[in-house]
């Protein structure tokens, strides 16, 4: 059974809505990663093994940067990691949250969706108490998920998986940084975790890029990790099809952020594109590098990144040899030697308006063909929007985590399941998730709305205001 979280959740959601553009004046405010010396690695860091701790500190965590969260202790770890290639050293930070009832042999790698490029969007900053109140619900919306997993007694490690350049959508980089965040957490002496600690990786939407690639790369990059499962949904498994799907639509701002992330990670793309961007295109990339999700999505609805107003000969953006070469390496499930070894539970709404369903399904099927044990659940209900699906499916995610942590058997091979609404699934209802289901429904109704109707309306209102002004 679960504690009655809904009152606290609704209060926080209300405060978030009422103070979205305000700064809470408090003492001892943390600094953003681009200004905080904690993020600057010590000399000689490049020679360290990936996953090596370079620096750590205790921090005070608060969801929504307002309310004190029930937890025993929290740490930030600066660690050595890799960019897209293993021989490209880098560093980043993960935030470790230890619940009061911590199970010292169970760890969850939680890759929250950042979906943006600004320094102040990094989880390690936004999660800290007294940080500026984020205008984005990316972390705040996942309040129920954080609380529920912590209530299970699982230690959380939440990496800044986009790295110091905040390279959103650079999947291989994100996968390496997520894996090394796990290694660094296991190496933190204060936690006294065993190397045999059972680990599960989770991510949704932009966070599923990190999780999906971590699942793919872990068997070769960190084979000694005791991964017992991966679960992710709303997955941009094929970056080319995702950018094409987003382009010109309501959530086109994500496409702008994705292009900026690829440009900032791949020098070959930067060299090719920088003299081709128009003033509008350059301004757009500069804007997303300084802002977070909501600001970006509200600023760039219906933007066409394949137009000549964005880039000279804009239609060539995704078809140029340089771009095709890079994007071709960012499709999940293509290489048989990049197949998850631990059980995978993957889920996606059939009517997802942000991330194309077909690409995610194709990746899951290919992984199955390559030998992965994978359950792919397709949600067909009209209320299953991109944003709302994550919370609506929380009971299934939690059941998967419980079963993997307890060593229960999983399916062999590939299995495809069809469900209308997970909260109405008899199997979920039978598990006694009544209180959690009520929390989820209230949280969705007060944020994005069922089928994401509130979120879509807000974007449309912003677009109309921009036209008028």
Curated annotation (Swiss-Prot):
Any one GO molecular function term: triacylglycerol lipase activity
Q: Tell me if Hydrolase is a UniProt keyword of this record.
A: yes
Q: Its GO biological process terms?
A: lipid catabolic process
Give the primary localization class: secreted
- Here the disulfide bonds are 121-292
**Homology family:** Belongs to the AB hydrolase superfamily. Lipase family. Class Lip subfamily.
Entry protein name? Secreted triacylglycerol lipase LIP3
Originating species: Malassezia restricta
């Amino acid at each position: 059974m679960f504690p009655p979280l809904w009152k606290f959740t609704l209060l926080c959601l209300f405060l978030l809505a009422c103070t979205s553009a305000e700064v809470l004046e408090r003492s001892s405010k943390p600094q953003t990663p681009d200004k905080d010396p904690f993020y600057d690695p010590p000399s000689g860091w490049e020679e360290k093994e990936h996953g090596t701790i370079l620096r750590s500190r205790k921090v005070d965590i608060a969801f929504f940067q307002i309310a004190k969260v029930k937890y025993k202790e929290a740490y930030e770890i600066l660690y050595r990691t890799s960019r897209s290639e293993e021989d490209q050293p880098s560093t980043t930070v993960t935030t470790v949250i230890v619940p009061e009832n911590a199970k010292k042999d169970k760890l969850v790698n939680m890759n929250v969706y950042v979906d943006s490029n600004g320094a102040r969007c990094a989880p390690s900053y936004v999660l800290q108490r007294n940080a500026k109140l984020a205008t984005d619900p990316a972390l705040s919306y996942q309040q129920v998920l954080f609380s529920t997993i912590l209530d299970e007694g699982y230690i959380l490690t939440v990496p800044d998986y986009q790295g110091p350049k905040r390279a959103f959508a650079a999947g291989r980089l994100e996968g390496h940084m997520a894996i090394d965040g796990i290694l660094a957490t296991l190496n933190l002496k204060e936690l006294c975790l065993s190397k045999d600690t059972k680990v599960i990786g989770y991510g949704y939407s932009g966070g599923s890029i990190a999780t999906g690639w971590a699942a793919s790369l872990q068997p070769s990059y960190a084979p000694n990790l005791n991964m017992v499962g991966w679960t992710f949904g709303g997955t941009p498994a094929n970056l080319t099809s995702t950018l094409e799907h987003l382009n010109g639509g309501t959530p086109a701002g994500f496409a702008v952020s994705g292009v900026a992330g690829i440009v900032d990670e791949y020098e070959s793309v930067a060299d090719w594109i920088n003299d081709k961007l128009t003033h509008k295109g350059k301004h757009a990339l500069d804007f997303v590098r300084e802002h977070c999700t909501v600001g970006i999505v509200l600023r760039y609805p219906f933007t066409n990144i394949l137009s000549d107003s964005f880039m000279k000969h804009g239609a060539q953006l995704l078809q140029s040899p340089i771009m095709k070469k890079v994007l071709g390496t960012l499709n999940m499930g293509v290489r048989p030697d990049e197949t998850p070894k631990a059980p995978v539970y993957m889920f996606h709404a059939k009517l997802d308006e942000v991330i194309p369903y077909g690409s995610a399904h194709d990746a899951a099927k290919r992984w199955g063909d390559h030998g992965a044990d994978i359950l792919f659940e397709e949600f067909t209900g009209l209320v299953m929007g991109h944003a709302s699906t994550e919370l609506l499916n929380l009971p299934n995610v939690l059941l998967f985590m419980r079963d993997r942590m307890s060593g229960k058997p999983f399916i062999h091979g590939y299995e495809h399941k069809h469900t209308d609404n997970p909260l109405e699934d008899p199997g979920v209802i039978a598990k006694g998730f009544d209180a959690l289901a009520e929390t989820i429904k209230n949280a969705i109704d007060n944020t994005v709305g069922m089928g994401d109707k509130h979120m879509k309306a807000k974007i449309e209102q912003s677009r109309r205001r921009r036209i008028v002004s």
